Amino acid sequence: FALLVTQTGNARATIEVMATPQVLILQHVPWERPGRILSNLEDIGLETVTMNIVDKKKPDLPDFGELAGVVIMGGPMGALDYDKYPGLKAEAKLARAAVASGKPILGVCLGHQIIATALGAQLRKGDAPEIGFAPIKRVDKHDFFSMWDKQLTVLHWHNDVVGLPAEGQLLSRSSSTKVQAFRLGSALGMQFHLEVCGSLLDEWLDEPSMVKDLKAAGGSKSQLREQFAQYDQLLQPLAEQVFSGFAARCNSYAQTLNK
């Protein structure tokens, strides 16, 4: 709530005004932006606030009760690196609170791992980095993630892998990563990157640390651009379904806050 002070003559009145619900986007590095997620939130008129709290032990977050939803983006750190990045602990606490209250929450890559570990899943190093385009297989369907094709080739960029939280619904997997997407309550986690559009990919490939990872995994900038051009059109329907659905859930949740 915000306080609005009005004055008529010598009389002053203080009125409690409901703040506009926002979707909180937690970003860990400048180039891991929300891309298509943000576009879908803006398309239906939702306000967003983007913060990077990884280095803050006690981050000054917006009032949780006034949030319409939460997005946790990717980054190069480990989901449990609390000593080096104390803000990740606050993000895990936020994830648990969102699920407990039914508030929509979406995690991508590191965000997927933060949500899963916050809900009790185990984190470990993958057998090898999964970087570039590779297929995922559908395991189950849900309105949050309606992958109609049995297999899709998506963009990956991670070293760690996470298990499935108890009571979580496994939605997709790959040959090297058993949990590529899952749902638990109001949470959706995706290990891969549906949010990346062409301009965001260019930002990734301008970032030296990303290029270093790509080359170490045997890839190249030209190859990745060619693969993006090949697969992106096939991925757009799923990206639209996932992110417009998340935006709609945030919008519905915002309406409950305004009552």
What label would you give each PLM region?
Residues 38-106:
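Flexible gly/pro-rich beta->alpha loop and the following alpha-helix that scaffold active-site loops
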Residues 25-30:
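N-terminal, positively charged, Ser/Thr/Ala/Gly-biased leader segments
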Residues 19-24:
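Extreme N-terminal starter segment of soluble prokaryotic enzymes
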Residues 119-200:
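Pocket-forming structural segment of enzyme catalytic cores
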Residues 32-36:
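Short N-terminal binding/cap micro-motifs at the start of the first secondary-structure element
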Residues 196-259:
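Acyltransferase
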Residues 98-122:
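Catalytic nucleophile loop
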Residues 3, 13-14:
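Short, positively charged and aromatic/hydrophobic N-terminal segments
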